[in-house]
Amino acid sequence: MSRRVKTLLIILAVLLVLAIVAVVILNHPTFGRRMSKERKARIEASLNWRDGMFQNQIPTPQFSGDKSMFRALWEFLTEGKKDRTPKEAVPAVKTDLKALPTDRDWLVWFGHSSYLFCLDGKRYLVDPVLKLEFPVTVMMRPFKGTDIYSTDDMPVIDMLIITHEHWDHLDYATLRDLKDKVKHVVCPLGVAEYLEYWGYDTKHITEMDWYEKVDNITCLPSRHFSNRMFKRNQTLWAAFLVESSGKKVYIGGDGGYDQRFKEVFEQYGCVDLALMENGQYNKDWANIHLMPDDLEKAILDLKAKQVFTVHHDKFSLAPHAWTEPDSIAHDIAERNSISLLDQPIGTVVEF
């Protein structure tokens, strides 16, 4: 056998192995499954579905600079500040969540956009990412000290709220292990396909379009996008408003600045607590994540009585210093006399 033929066979063998590995990985449950015809029909009937995908309320190019998508991604991977990750463990407190009383309103943050709050006697868990497994660990690694909570620590959850399908908000391993503790799930259109595939009972899932209200929860617009594999914007992204007999909590989800924050105030009045995205921003994707100046405008538009910022302190998904979002939030609060609830991971914050 000639050297040329041997080389060709080796190349073919390597390609075959890579193809097999790709098939195995892409068939992992974390990637979901093909959407059912019934769900697809409901999605396509949405007023927010146009030209084969969900659309934002205003035009939203994913990349806002003059660079190509590939150049922006390359710079993100190869450049940026050296202090994107902490050198020491991030401060965190281990709280017995099951022992927390339900006769008071409180919040416990787990880093990034995962948090548990109690409102009017009910426990709400938002975007829990607590138990990363392969292949997600290839893309995201939590900062040291931020992974002290597991699904075993969670109490019974009255309502699980998912804002969108991105990896840092919808985690297969976490939701798989939480299933028996969750009474009901609320999510934007299309996201329930993942949950049903992962074992959640359809009867206990409510999919919502923007401005739909079910019981005390209203699904509201955000300015973002979705893609978990290759095709973009096939599931919806959202913010949520949770109301009780005396208070309102705004769950901002992910998304760039637009008129929606003013509209929330105009339609629903002052919210008692606003959970605002603050982190993983960059000028190259300023349309789909809140930049620091936009965070300030959004908070002022909302006129929230109290603010807690999330989307930071756990993963490095943008080229800013990991401590920068906290500093920005404090500066905004000081300039505008805003009540900022800023506590370490795991701390019980009453509101």
For each of these PLM feature ranges, what is it?
Residues 128-130, 165, 222-224, 253-255, ...:
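Active-site metal-binding loops of divalent metal-dependent hydrolases
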